[in-house]
């Protein structure tokens, strides 16, 4: 029996074992790469700043500075531009709090970025501690989900960072099946919906994971793992199939029957509210899909489906870079950095080979089986993939980078790893404990020694300051002097030859956001009709005419109403006649 006097000390030690790895990771993997005084931004001049724009747009919207959330003023005058990509509505309030505390736009983004890692780890710890895993098992599983190599490989895509809904939703699905209750069903729906609001990509992949787990759960029930009976095989097979078919209806009926009438009504109201909020979120995406015709061809998706070799690529890891180099290059390789790390692979092999019986075994192999199924379904070999059948489901034709499903699969992988570590720790062998602590240290080092992609915050801000200065100094015909700005001006910025095409587009978006102007420039996951790189001023009339064709406008006055408001910056080939007559 535990000594009551030592319980507080033991609890403190347990919490230290859980949280010290997180703090080390936060310092060495997240904070240190951001440079002294947070001088560096995670990622490059592309998606990082685009996500910063989205978050700032939300902040301006709640302040009343931007009138319509979904009609952000880039790719102007095309509507519903926020729905061209992820919206970050589920996490933008956190950013707004940082902005309200007087942090500037870029620093508030860094704070939002760092908070995401804390929330992911906290969700893991909450779930795994409720399962009563040993502290070191909790730490290793949570560390992998939060700081694992596949997650770091997506640091240029901050929209994929917040995944705290994944462990919470998966845990509630398991708990509901074990002990049905409508509160758990409501909680499951809540975290799924919030995950969609945090990021549509992760939300869709979470639903796929939950669907597979729901199908598997009856097979991993306590009855399924009971001792074999003496019935003939065909009777056992029929009984197993019947139990599998009826399992979920019986669980739902049990949860419903054991709830009071007020509880049932409250459940229906809450689920209806969650459904309505999800419909409100996805409605604009449905709209742009049909109005703009956005969808991904199967050939586009095929490039972004995991290949067998994808799970062995970690080009940014100095530890595994040489091994990754033996894999021949292929299109979109940056999206195929799916190697989970040598430590996790070793833990998985140990868990599969030892099959140590513990109270978590059913849960562990449920998670591992779900990973195996989704890996097989999404895998492409010589152009063939079972995912082609899923691709026809509503919404999935808009998903291009299916490789990102690894970010969701890191949770069930982490659960299985936690189970293995917990089972080994239960053997209470000093030498085995030492090996486990060594494995945890190596897992930390795999992520610490990672070549991060960062951008100078000062350089990014200087780009915007330089663009603002051009508004006042550029000559007429290539830009309008500030004293002669038209009413309600529209910004249009050229691309310097040395710049990647997206950098000046986002420069224009951010400067226009500061000024409260719309801009013809833009960057997103999809592009409107007629979009061209801003290498030539001819994009200006072409984009306006593309908008007119999109809205079925044909009169020259509509063209002139728009172009007379345009302030072009950095172009040398603008024809002054375009401002008085629509070109053919």
Question: Predicted segment positions?
Answer:
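Membrane-interface helix-loop-helix junctions at transmembrane boundaries of multi-pass membrane enzymes
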Residues: 11, 225-266, 347-386, 427-432
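Transmembrane signal-anchor helices characteristic of membrane glycosylation enzymes that use polyprenol
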Residues: 14-46, 53, 57-60, 270-290, ...
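Membrane-embedded helix bundles of polyisoprenyl
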Residues: 22, 28, 112-131, 135-218, ...
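Periplasmic/ER-lumenal interhelical loops and adjacent helix-loop junctions
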Residues: 45-61, 236, 243-247, 272-351
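Signature aromatic-anchored transmembrane alpha helix within multi-pass, membrane-resident enzymes
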Residues: 265-274, 359-360, 415, 419-449
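Extracytoplasmic
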Residues: 444-584
């Amino acid at each position: 029996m535990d000594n009551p006097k030592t319980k507080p000390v033991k609890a403190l030690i347990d919490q230290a074992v859980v949280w010290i790895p997180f703090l080390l990771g936060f310092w060495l993997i997240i904070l240190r790469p951001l440079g002294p005084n947070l001088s560096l931004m995670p990622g490059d001049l592309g998606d990082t700043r685009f996500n910063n724009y989205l978050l700032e747009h939300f902040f301006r919207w709640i302040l009343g500075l931007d009138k319509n959330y979904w009609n952000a003023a880039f790719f102007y005058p095309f509507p519903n531009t926020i729905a061209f990509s992820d919206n970050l509505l589920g996490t933008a309030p956190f950013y707004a709090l940082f902005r309200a505390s007087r942090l500037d736009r870029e620093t508030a983004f860094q704070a939002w970025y760092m908070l995401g890692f804390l929330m992911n780890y906290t969700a893991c710890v909450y779930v795994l501690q409720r399962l009563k895993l040993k502290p070191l098992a909790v730490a290793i599983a949570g560390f992998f989900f939060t700081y694992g190599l596949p997650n770091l490989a997506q640091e240029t895509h901050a929209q994929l960072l917040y995944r705290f809904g994944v462990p919470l939703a998966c845990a509630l699905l398991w708990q509901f099946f074990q002990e049905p209750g409508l509160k758990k069903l409501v909680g499951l729906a809540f975290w799924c919906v919030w995950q969609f609001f945090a990021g549509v990509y992760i939300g869709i992949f979470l639903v796929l994971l939950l669907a597979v787990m729901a199908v598997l759960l009856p097979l991993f029930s306590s009855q399924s793992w009971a001792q074999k009976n003496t019935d003939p095989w065909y009777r056992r097979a029929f009984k197993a199939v019947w139990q599998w078919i009826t399992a979920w209806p019986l669980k739902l009926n049990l949860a419903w029957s054991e709830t009071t009438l007020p509880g049932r009504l409250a459940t229906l109201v809450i689920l209806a509210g969650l459904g309505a909020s999800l419909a409100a979120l996805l409605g604009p995406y449905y709209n742009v899909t049909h109005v703009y015709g956005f969808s991904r061809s199967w050939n586009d998706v095929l490039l972004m489906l995991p290949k067998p070799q994808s799970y062995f690529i970690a080009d940014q890891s100095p530890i595994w870079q040489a091994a990754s180099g033996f894999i021949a290059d292929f299109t979109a390789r940056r999206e195929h950095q799916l190697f989970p790390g040598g430590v996790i692979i070793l833990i998985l092999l140990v868990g599969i080979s030892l099959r140590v019986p513990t109270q978590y075994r059913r849960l562990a192999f449920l998670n591992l089986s779900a990973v195996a199924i989704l890996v097989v379904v999404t895998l492409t070999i010589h152009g063939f993939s079972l995912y082609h059948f899923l691709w026809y489901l509503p919404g999935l034709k808009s998903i291009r980078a299916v490789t990102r499903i690894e970010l969701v699969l890191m949770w069930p992988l982490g659960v299985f790893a936690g189970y293995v570590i917990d089972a080994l720790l239960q053997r209470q062998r000093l030498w085995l404990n030492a090996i486990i602590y060594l494995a945890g240290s190596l897992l930390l080092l795999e992520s610490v020694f990672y070549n991060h992609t960062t951008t100078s915050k000062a350089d990014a801000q200087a780009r915007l300051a330089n663009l603002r200065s051009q508004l006042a100094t550029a000559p007429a015909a290539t830009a309008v002097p500030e004293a002669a700005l038209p009413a309600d001006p529209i910004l249009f910025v050229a691309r310097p030859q040395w710049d990647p095409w997206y950098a000046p587009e986002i420069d224009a978006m951010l400067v226009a956001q500061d000024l409260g102007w719309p801009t013809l420039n833009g960057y997103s996951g999809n592009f409107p009709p007629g979009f061209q790189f801003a290498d030539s001023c001819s994009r200006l009339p072409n984009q306006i005419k593309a908008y007119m064709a999109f809205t079925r406008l044909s009169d020259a006055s509509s063209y002139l109403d728009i172009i007379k408001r345009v302030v072009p910056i950095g172009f040398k080939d603008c024809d002054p006649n375009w401002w008085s007559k629509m070109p053919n």
